[in-house]
Design a protein with these regions (language model features):
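Short linker/helix segments within small regulatory modules
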Residues: 146-156
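Short edge beta-strands and adjacent turn/loop segments
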Residues: 18-48
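Short functional micro-motifs and their immediate structural scaffolds
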Residues: 139-143, 167
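Short cysteine-rich clusters marking metal-coordination/redox-active sites
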Residues: 134-137, 159-162
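Residues immediately within or flanking Cys/His clusters that coordinate Zn2+
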Residues: 131, 139, 156
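Short metal-binding segments enriched for Cys and/or His
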Residues: 161-172
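N-proximal, solvent-exposed amphipathic alpha-helical segments enriched in charged/polar residues
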Residues: 1-26
């Protein structure tokens, strides 16, 4: 039987196509299961999309199937995308947060996220103009430049101190 940790180690080598972070550190992997068969091992990966309709899902699925499928003893790989539990920035590992910071992307603090299982009505989510520390110089002299970034999960901030723009992940 193939080791679950070995599969996770392979999954750690797969980068998210839109951010400088592995899919494991981004918190996309919910579960990994292995079933033995006469022909080899069948690997089941359950993953969470950051957003419904994320255009990178097919690419990530192909990368998982390809990389894990190359492991000795693996007969087949099945990837299933689920929306429950919903992905949130709280799932990003500390190593992932550091990698994002090094590449100029900040991440909201963990906790205080909306629990969708306890909400019975539509709840408006506003994008606040709270100052975010600049990942380049550390200054708090920053401002929201645009709530719309290069992907649906990011927004653009501007640092008045070092005059750099940077991305910040939305708290979902």
């Amino acid at each position: 039987m193939i080791d679950r940790q070995a599969i996770l180690d392979v999954l750690r080598t797969i980068p998210d196509p839109e951010m400088p972070i592995s899919i494991v550190d981004l918190g996309l992997i919910e579960t990994v299961g292995v079933t033995s068969s006469a022909d080899g091992n069948v690997v089941e990966v359950v993953a969470l999309p950051t957003f419904v309709g994320c255009p990178a899902l097919d690419m990530i699925r192909r990368d998982i199937e390809s990389r894990v499928g190359e492991m000795p003893g693996v007969e087949s790989v099945h990837v299933q995308w689920v929306n429950d539990p919903p992905w949130s920035v709280d799932r990003i590992s500390e190593a992932g947060r550091e990698s994002l910071r090094e590449h100029g992307v900040t991440v909201p603090d963990t906790g205080n996220r909306l629990d969708v299982h306890q909400v019975s009505a539509t709840v408006p989510i506003t994008v606040g103009a709270t100052a975010i520390p600049c990942p380049f110089c550390g200054s708090m002299d920053t401002q929201l430049d645009s709530p719309f970034g290069p992907t649906r999960c990011r927004m653009i901030y501007y640092c008045d101190a070092c005059r750099n723009t940077f991305e910040h992940l939305k708290k979902v």
